[in-house]
Amino acid sequence: MFVQILGSAAGGGFPQWNCNCVNCAGFRDGSLRAQARTQSSIAISDDGVNWVLCNASPDIRAQLQSFAPMQPGRALRDTGIGAIILMDSQIDHTTGLLSLREGCPHQVWCTDMVHEDLSTGFPLFKMLSHWNGGLSWNRIELDQSFSIPACPNLRFTPLPLRSAAPPYSPHRFDPHPGDNIGLIVEDLRSGGKLFYAPGLGKVDAPLLEIMAASDVLLVDGTLWEDDEMQRRGVGTRTGREMGHLAQNGPGGMLEVLEQLPRQRKVLIHINNTNPILDEDSAERAELVRRKVEVAYDGMSIEL
């Protein structure tokens, strides 16, 4: 199985266009040693030719341009994207579908709740129906694994996660199973398993067992502290209110990952305020000590 990190930042990317927090300002003036990052999206393949796109970020055009296998050049109009999975209906995970309209129809896998959001509050399915058939919906059943013809050697298993629907959603304050999912992706040939959850608000005992049975954990790295947005003076909501488990503190992501010594551990969906973006920070050094990696645009993983 091939996993390509197309984008590794949270919504807004890094540096965020309108932000002058210590990270964004430091990156712009050159005083901060860090890498620019686009908004979160990955691609998965069983052969390196045909790819399943997981989330379509607003930065999708630049992301595809930077990864040559996404343009195999077999015809005058071509793409390596064989299917698209939407983990949720967040703006920063779905807006890229608009930029992919020239390639419609696209096979899109998502839950009932995500499809509902993208047919009402942010009606992408209706909007894109005017482009060569638009988006062909394939329902993700929460209690069933599924396969995708573009990558027949991979099995996808959805995991309903405790998180939050987007601010535009008609049920923003009425959460439902399927608002946000994680994925177990298993290579049926090698047995390798990827656990992918860019939006993870809580890890309970059953989910921890699932993570322990995986080989690579690609998990929510949004915030270092739960009140980070407040500390940085750029927001009022906590990580938990936004559906993101912070790395630091009791019950935080690092405490969870400490219980999983065998797995390769990688943080993704990193907010522009997170001090781990600073490669010289104490927080980044703590991740190195714990053998927890920080995803970056262009990172490749094989398992």
Swiss-Prot record:
This is Coenzyme PQQ synthesis protein B. Gene3D superfamilies: Ribonuclease Z/Hydroxyacylglutathione hydrolase-like (3.60.15.10). Belongs to the PqqB family. PANTHER family: COENZYME PQQ SYNTHESIS PROTEIN B, HYDROLASE C777.06C-RELATED-RELATED. Pfam families: Lactamase_B_2 (PF12706). May be involved in the transport of PQQ or its precursor to the periplasm. GO terms for biological process: pyrroloquinoline quinone biosynthetic process.
